[in-house]
């Protein structure tokens, strides 16, 4: 059957994410992915809650999601769409390689719904670079470019 006749994956729920990502609580930072366009672009969703462990110390009287976790959520979204679209049966792992041009524009707080827009801008062999934007209520809160490498279990890095 050709790829044109196959059903395209348009969304991934938490079970699909758990099947491809190695991350688990408290470091799985995306709840769902929607608007998937192959391994080219997608929108990750992170529902930010006060129950997350980083809010205990960041900051007790004014809880703010650490910027590094926003970037990690972007990277997990990019990695997940890469792994969800793999044609091989061999298990893959995504290794986060670089962060470029990261900017944080406003705080993300408990109760926010973080939308993580990722778009592939470059690929060479098993390394992909993504342009990422995070928004809350239609307002850009962060942006970055991230690069990652896919490795399979029987390959050497």
Swiss-Prot record:
Q: Note the CDD domains from the entry.
A: FabZ
Q: Which family does it belong to?
A: Belongs to the thioester dehydratase family. FabZ subfamily.
Q: Which domain of life is it from?
A: Bacteria
Give the residues annotated as active site: 58
Instruction: Provide the Gene Ontology terms for cellular component.
Output: cytoplasm; membrane
What reaction is this protein's catalytic activity?
a (3R)-hydroxyacyl-[ACP] = a (2E)-enoyl-[ACP] + H2O
Q: Which UniProt keywords apply?
A: Cytoplasm, Lipid A biosynthesis, Lipid biosynthesis, Lipid metabolism, Lyase
What EC number(s) does the entry state?
4.2.1.59
Q: What does this protein do?
A: Involved in unsaturated fatty acids biosynthesis. Catalyzes the dehydration of short chain beta-hydroxyacyl-ACPs and long chain saturated and unsaturated beta-hydroxyacyl-ACPs.
Q: What class of enzyme is it?
A: lyase
Return the HAMAP family for the record.
FabZ
Xref: Pfam families: FabA
Provide a GO biological process annotation: fatty acid biosynthetic process
Any idea which GO molecular function terms this record carries?
Answer: (3R)-hydroxyacyl-[acyl-carrier-protein] dehydratase activity
Query: Which cellular compartments is it found in?
Result: Cytoplasm
PANTHER family in the cross-refs: 3-HYDROXYACYL-[ACYL-CARRIER-PROTEIN] DEHYDRATASE (PTHR30272:SF1)
UniProt protein name:
3-hydroxyacyl-[acyl-carrier-protein] dehydratase FabZ
Organism of provenance: Brucella melitensis biotype 2 (strain ATCC 23457)
